Amino acid sequence: MMIGEQLLKKLFPDFEELVQPAGIDLRVDKVYRQMGPGSLIDDEKNLPPLEMLEPPIYRLEPGKAYLASVDRMIEIPEGYAMLYLPRSTLLRSFVSVQTAVGDPGFRGTLQFLLHNHGEYEYTLKRGERIVQAVVFPVEGSGKYSGSYQE
């Protein structure tokens, strides 16, 4: 069962103005381009070097992927998980957002992959809503303790 507007406002009071009937809108803050290789071998993470694009207007080149962070930290309460879905305006503009699961107990700044699949540049302004987080209860879960915890 997905969590609705009233409970979302109680669970995530810092996001009250972004709560929708079935989720929480999240806004883009910083956008980065990849500047070199990365790897994941035998569970060893070597993230690629990044270069931050100059805000407040981000220009996404056709066929390119970018890492985007949201404008504030989030804390997912124990017993709940988040899934992140792209805003339909981006999809209608040939821009996809690739995401992961937000585990119970995660606290930190979320990052997503933006990919301009179109033939033309796409312009995105800092502060625009790019994803909607939907929240589900999770029974019998532990708490996130991975390397991206802040």
UniProtKB/Swiss-Prot annotation:
Instruction: Tell me the organism.
Output: Methanothermobacter thermautotrophicus (strain ATCC 29096 / DSM 1053 / JCM 10044 / NBRC 100330 / Delta H) (Methanobacterium thermoautotrophicum)
Q: What is its EC number?
A: 3.6.1.23
Provide the leader sequence positions: none
Family listed: Belongs to the dCTP deaminase family. Archaeal dUTPase subfamily.
Q: In which pathway does it act?
A: Pyrimidine metabolism; dUMP biosynthesis; dUMP from dCTP (dUTP route): step 2/2
What does the entry give for GO biological process?
dUMP biosynthetic process; dUTP biosynthetic process
Judged by the first EC level, this protein's enzyme class is: hydrolase
Question: What Gene3D superfamilies does UniProt report for this protein, alphabetically?
Answer: 2.70.40.10
Catalysed reaction(s) here are:
dUTP + H2O = dUMP + diphosphate + H(+)
Q: Name one GO molecular function term.
A: dUTP diphosphatase activity
* Entries under HAMAP family matching the protein: dUTPase_arch
What biological function has been recorded for the protein in this entry?
Answer: This enzyme is involved in nucleotide metabolism: it produces dUMP, the immediate precursor of thymidine nucleotides and it decreases the intracellular concentration of dUTP so that uracil cannot be incorporated into DNA.
Sorted alphabetically, which keywords does the UniProt record give?
A: Hydrolase, Nucleotide metabolism
Task: Provide an example Pfam family for this protein.
Answer: DCD
Q: Which gene encodes it?
A: dut
> What's the protein here called?
Probable deoxyuridine 5'-triphosphate nucleotidohydrolase
